[in-house]
UniProtKB/Swiss-Prot annotation:
Location relative to the cell: Mitochondrion matrix
Keyword Nucleotidyltransferase on entry: no
Coiled coil: none
Keywords on record: Chaperone, Mitochondrion, Transit peptide
Name under which the protein is recorded: Succinate dehydrogenase assembly factor 2-B, mitochondrial
GO cellular component: mitochondrial matrix; mitochondrion
A GO BP annotation: mitochondrial respiratory chain complex II assembly
Major subcellular site: mitochondrion
Transit peptide: 1-24
């Protein structure tokens, strides 16, 4: 199945660089077309990739949950979210109620693709209703960075 995917046209579209010039068969030699990021952002996940369900932790103490969320916010696997979420958590997490902490936990662990969180927070894509919560609105406000705080590294622990 993997071999079929690797040699399919869908995989070639995924691997093509974001702003790489390419020529179509109908174009002349002096005319070059460019692929824009918006054409690449919206690829659907292949149906053969199962996404495991995140395990719920109903009996987890609030302080333990906050410590786990602090760690998970700093270790996302993509620098953009590492910076946004770690600075957001450093600013707000200690003041979150149990309900707000649960909303934040659902946001960062319920979504299977970190790029979705990034696009929703930067308002590149509309936020689905189930994630359009008070915490998401706070995150969007944080991302706007109206105080013009420099966020080039994660805050100290």
């Amino acid at each position: 199945m993997l071999r079929q995917f690797l040699f399919s046209t869908a995989s070639r579209r995924l691997v093509r660089p974001m702003i790489a010039p390419h020529r179509s068969a109908s174009s002349s030699l002096d005319k070059t077309e460019f692929t824009t990021p918006s054409q690449i952002v919206d690829y659907d996940d292949p149906p053969h990739l199962p996404v495991p369900e995140y395990p719920l932790r109903p009996d987890e103490p609030l302080e333990t949950r906050k410590q786990r969320l602090l760690y998970q916010s700093r270790k996302r696997g993509m620098l953009e979210n590492d910076l946004l979420l770690s600075t957001f958590v450093a600013k707000h997490l200690r003041d979150f109620s149990a309900a707000q902490t649960a909303q934040y936990d659902d946001l960062i662990n319920g979504v299977s693709n970190d790029w979705d969180i990034f696009y929703w927070a930067t308002e590149t894509k509309p936020t689905p209703p189930q994630y359009d919560t008070e915490i998401m609105r706070m995150l969007k406000q944080h991302v706007k960075n109206e105080e013009r705080v420099q966020r080039i590294r994660q805050p100290d622990l």
